From Swiss-Prot:
<feature type="transmembrane region" description="Helical">
    <location>
        <begin position="2"/>
        <end position="22"/>
    </location>
</feature>
<keyword id="KW-1133">Transmembrane helix</keyword>
<keyword id="KW-0830">Ubiquinone</keyword>
<keyword id="KW-0249">Electron transport</keyword>
<keyword id="KW-0679">Respiratory chain</keyword>
<feature type="transmembrane region" description="Helical">
    <location>
        <begin position="29"/>
        <end position="49"/>
    </location>
</feature>
<dbReference type="InterPro" id="IPR001133">
    <property type="entry name" value="NADH_UbQ_OxRdtase_chain4L/K"/>
</dbReference>
<keyword id="KW-0496">Mitochondrion</keyword>
<keyword id="KW-0520">NAD</keyword>
<comment type="function">
    <text>Core subunit of the mitochondrial membrane respiratory chain NADH dehydrogenase (Complex I) which catalyzes electron transfer from NADH through the respiratory chain, using ubiquinone as an electron acceptor. Part of the enzyme membrane arm which is embedded in the lipid bilayer and involved in proton translocation.</text>
</comment>
<dbReference type="Pfam" id="PF00420">
    <property type="entry name" value="Oxidored_q2"/>
</dbReference>
<keyword id="KW-0999">Mitochondrion inner membrane</keyword>
<dbReference type="GO" id="GO:0008137">
    <property type="term" value="F:NADH dehydrogenase (ubiquinone) activity"/>
</dbReference>
<dbReference type="GO" id="GO:0005743">
    <property type="term" value="C:mitochondrial inner membrane"/>
</dbReference>
<keyword id="KW-0812">Transmembrane</keyword>
<keyword id="KW-0813">Transport</keyword>
<comment type="subunit">
    <text>Core subunit of respiratory chain NADH dehydrogenase (Complex I) which is composed of 45 different subunits.</text>
</comment>
């Protein structure tokens, strides 16, 4: 396995660990989720370039589009929650309540 793949896999693992450690804050969770998506994007580009899958060049772009949509929805949720409650602690929120 090349060193670039090991580094990107390590970045994904660190973002996943950050997601588990900082799960009480919404902003930290969104940043870790974005790091996971970007490392998955780079890994998919490397995989496609190494295996010469010319047909599936659209898959990393689709992943990047979904990551942008996820970030936009997450930031909108963060703004709504911080305007309503004044904090971003996930543990204190009950979003299922009307």
């Amino acid at each position: 396995m090349p060193s670039i793949s090991i580094n990107i896999t390590l970045a994904f693992t660190m973002a996943l660990t950050g997601m588990l450690v900082f799960r009480s804050h919404l902003m930290s969770s969104l940043l870790c989720l974005e790091g996971m998506m970007l490392s998955m994007f780079i890994l998919s580009i490397l995989f496609i370039m190494n295996m010469h899958f010319t047909v599936s060049f659209i898959m990393p772009i689709l992943l990047l589009v979904l990551a942008a949509c996820e970030a936009a929805i997450g930031l909108a949720l963060l703004v709504m929650v911080s305007n309503t409650y004044g904090l971003d602690y996930v543990q204190n929120l009950n979003l299922l309540q009307c």
